[in-house]
Amino acid sequence: MELHILEHRVRVLSLARPGLWLYTHPLIKLLFLPSRSRCKFFSLTETPEDYTLMVDEEGFKELPPSEFLQVAEATWLVMNVSHSGSVVQAAGVTKIARSVIAPLAEHHVSVLMLSTYQTDFILVREQDLSVVIHTLAREFQIYREVGGEPVPVTGDDSSNGFPQAQHGPSPTVHPIQSPQNRFCVLTLDPETLPAVATTLIDVLFYSHSVPKEAASGGPESTSIPFFAFSLIEGYISIVMDAETQKKFPSDLLLTSSSGELWRMVRIGGQPLGFDECGIVAQIAGPLAAVDVSAYYISTFNFDHALVPEDEISCVIDILQRRQEGLASKDP
C-alpha cells in the first residue's frame, strides 16, 4: 500500500452562525468560482453549533479575520492511502483503521478525518509529520507530493527521538448520539455546479430548519442540521440528509448504484479540541473489527461517523458496550 502526503497545507476554522453574513461573498467565491481562486482544498461543514471550514493557504487568504472566525493554531497536512497507485474508492475509514489510525493513536498523533465520495483524507499536524513517517514507514511506501509529482520518502529505521507506542491510561470515553436523519453521500460534475448554485446557496446560507421526517416523535427521534460540501482538487463531494436532497435536481446528483442511505454517530458531549489522540481510533477500530464501512467527518467541535442505515443499531450497540467496558476499567 502507498501513503501519499499531499501538497495542501490546511487550516481548520470555526465560523459562528451569527457571522455567516460577513463571509457570504468569499464563501460563494470558493464554492462556485474556483477559477478565480488558487484554492485547491476547500471543505465546508454545517453542524448545529457552527460551520467548520478546512481550507488550504490560498483559501485561508480569502477569509478576513473577525470576531466570528475562530482559527485552530496548527497547520495540517493531508494524506490518503492508495492501492497500486489508485486511490481506494470504497467508504473506507474502517479499511485504514488498523494500518493508519490505530498506530498513529498509539504514538500520540492527533488526527482529523475528512471522508468524501471519492476518498478518505487523513489530516495530521505539520509538526507531527516526522513521527507519522516513522510510525507508518514499515507498513507503507510513503510518497510526498512536490510540484505535483510523488517523491519517495524514506523512513528512518532508528527510533531515537521518537515516542514509542504506548498503551497508557484508557482513552476518554466520549458520549455518542445518533440523530434520526438519513444521509446521502453524493458527487456532482463540476460543470453542472452552476445549475444547482441557487439551491446550494439556499441550503447552506438560508435554510436552517430541522428536516420534516423527524420533526415529530419521541425524545430520541431528533434530527440535526448537517451538510458537508467539499471541492478538493476539482472533485466535489456532498453529504446531506435525504430530505434536503429532495430540493436538488435528481438527475445532477450522482451516487453509488445502490443508492445507499447512511445514519450518523455523533461523537462528543463537549467540544473535543485538537490535542486528544485516539478519538477516531475509538470509533474506527470497533467498526473495522466487524467490517462495517464508515465515512468519517471531523469538525471543529465534534466528530461524525456515517454508517449504513441497516447497520446503525448494531453499531450503536457495539460502541456502547465498548464505552461501558472502558468506563468499568476506570478507578
Curated annotation (Swiss-Prot):
Residues binding L-arginine: S110, V111, G273, I279, V280, T299, F300, N301, F302, D303
Pfam family for this entry, one: ACT_7
Keywords noted in UniProt: Cytoplasm, Phosphoprotein, Ubl conjugation
One GO BP: cellular response to amino acid starvation
Annotated stretches, region: Disordered: 155-174
InterPro entries given in the database record: ACT-like_dom_sf, CASTOR1_ACT-like, CASTOR1_N, CASTOR_ACT_dom, CASTOR_fam, CASTOR_mTORC1
Annotated GO CC locations: cytosol; GATOR2 complex
Boundaries of every ACT domain copy: 72-139, 262-322
Domain description: Based on x-ray crystallography data, the protein would be constituted of 4 tandem ACT domains instead of the 2 predicted from the sequence.
Function: Functions as an intracellular arginine sensor within the amino acid-sensing branch of the TORC1 signaling pathway. As a homodimer or a heterodimer with CASTOR2, binds and inhibits the GATOR subcomplex GATOR2 and thereby mTORC1. Binding of arginine to CASTOR1 allosterically disrupts the interaction of CASTOR1-containing dimers with GATOR2 which can in turn activate mTORC1 and the TORC1 signaling pathway.
Family: Belongs to the GATS family.
Assembly information from the UniProt record: Forms homodimers and heterodimers with CASTOR2. Interacts with the GATOR2 complex which is composed of MIOS, SEC13, SEH1L, WDR24 and WDR59; the interaction is negatively regulated by arginine. Interacts with TM4SF5; the interaction is positively regulated by leucine and is negatively regulated by arginine.
The protein's name: Cytosolic arginine sensor for mTORC1 subunit 1
Organism: Rattus norvegicus
Lineage of the species this protein comes from: Eukaryota, Metazoa, Chordata, Craniata, Vertebrata
